[in-house]
Amino acid sequence: MSKVIGIDLGTTNSCIAIMDGSQPRVVENAEGARTTPSIVAFTDDERLVGQPAKRQAVTNPDNTIFGVKRLIGRRNDDAALAKDKKNLPFAVIDGGNGDAWVEAKGEKYSPSQISAFILGKMKETAESYLGEDVTQAVITVPAYFNDAQRQATKDAGKIAGLEVLRIINEPTAAALAYGLDKEQTQTIAVYDLGGGTFDVTILEIDDGLFEVKSTNGDTFLGGEDFDMRIVNYLADTFKKEHSVDLTQDKMALQRLKEAAEKAKIELSSSSQTEINQPFISMGSNGQPLHMVMKLTRSKLESLVGDLIKASLKPCKDALKDAGLSASDIDEIVLVGGMTRMPKVVEEVTKFFGKEPHKGVNPDEVVAMGAAIQAGVLQGDVKDVVLLDVTPLSLGIETLGGVFTRLIDRNTTIPTKKSQIFSTAEDNQNAVTIRVFQGEREMAADNKILGAFNLENIPPAPRGMPQIEVTFDIDANGIVSVGAMDKGTGKEQKITIQASGGLSDEDIEKMVKDAEENADADKARRELIEAKNQAESLIHSTEKSLEEHSDKVDPTTVEAIELAIAALKDEMESENADKIKSGIQNVTEAAMKLGEAIYNASQEENDDVAEPADGPHDDQDDIVDAEFEDLDNDKRA
């Protein structure tokens, strides 16, 4: 049975881990890094994922997609997306079903598809390390992801060729990695401020039992927002000095974004940094303009202070829902790259009244927790029980547009809940069940997950029919809803899919596209490897020919030269099979040269004759050497 892998699919970076014996192990990617940038780029002839995509972002901003996790499972008209759209160098469009999609090189891609390309890279990383195919995974999501976002993440796994055995919340995964070997009872808070999302989760750990008490968060608060504050500050300052708006230039905007991220990281360990971007724009008279600017840690803290404060309200709400106070928390575990910022650590310390735990790597701990959960599902990890919760209340719209809750937030999952409803009018023969998720009192103010009809209800006075509505949430946090007319036994069930979302046909098409692209990628890699091998062979053969052509007859030299010329022509054909055939021809032709060189070398060795008398044992000329044995204390 192949390994089940654990993947932290992050907004900024992604990470993969496996169980190595009894401990999780992070696997390095092809570039030798332990995390992979969650970036996908499209060029004229290939698709790039990870570090190669990040390297070319400045010169190809329109077709370099990043931060797609903030789009996944969202509608294109989502108010939260509006501020992001104007800051993104690539196009965010309506996917035709109301969902937010992206456009690159004239093609439309769903966020699930882009995420699948990243997951595909993680899958390749695992397969390269393990030396076997990988088909199953545990994937993490922010705890505050709603049903549509969870379903879209699961779709991404399917498109990437992975069976997603479990969707697990990021803070819960971090808690698993933190508490795997802890035997004492502890109440911990996981503060997870990542690249695009924020979560806080309160858990109780007791000798292998991980029970989530409450969770809260903001799926639009993270490092991307911090970066944009710096970008806007730099752009505003530059505009005041030079009357040039850099935000209107996509390449300049991408350079600013990279500079902002670099400055933010540097200011976590130093009090000041310099942002130096030569030739970032042109002045009105055509002269080049350069950006050289100092940014201090205190200035950065003033720019993002409200964002850090915004993370504390979910902390208060999570404690309240758990029925605890800050003093009841035994340990605070920091997760996500943004928790390296000193001001974040300071505010968290002040809020909880104690120093956070520093024994986990905030970039890797979530993937390690996912690997542990994978180990639990595979049977490799024993005596670990995870009890997670649903982050948001679930219910239906009832008379007057009221949101009637069936399952409250922070209910332990998996769970199932039923409630009896009735008709609103006399002789009503059908009811529409509209399913919502959220905390507002009116249904319209919450997130609609889907709707379905229960039909052919026998005529009866209003309030008479008994319609049982049942909500079922699985361990992934994905919702199924059913409705049954108790009088007739008629039943209707659906697994909630985002209104919009990806249909089964969409997913199958994307799976097929991914497989075709995988074949194309493999063919391209074979072509590159064949070309590299051909170039190396041509170089070594020509060098040998130059040095040893006098050792073979002219016919052999001509045959080798013709084979090399043919191989050079085949390298222009972009056909790996032809190049491999040419390599074989050059190798065979060059064998005669190799034999001639070997034979010539043997003849030279044979010409070295022994002295005429032969060997002798005469020791008359041997002189005994004199030596002095030094004491140990005099030796060097």
Swiss-Prot record:
Phosphothreonine, modified sites: 197
Species for this entry: Roseobacter denitrificans (strain ATCC 33942 / OCh 114) (Erythrobacter sp. (strain OCh 114))
Ranges of biased composition (kind: Acidic residues): 618-636
Annotated SUPFAM superfamilies: Actin-like ATPase domain, Heat shock protein 70kD (HSP70), C-terminal subdomain, Heat shock protein 70kD (HSP70), peptide-binding domain
Family: Belongs to the heat shock protein 70 family.
Keywords of this entry: ATP-binding, Chaperone, Nucleotide-binding, Phosphoprotein, Stress response
Domain of life of the native organism: Bacteria
PANTHER family according to UniProt: HEAT SHOCK PROTEIN 70KDA
Protein name: Chaperone protein DnaK
Gene name in the database record: dnaK
Protein role: Acts as a chaperone.
Region (Disordered): 533-552, 595-636
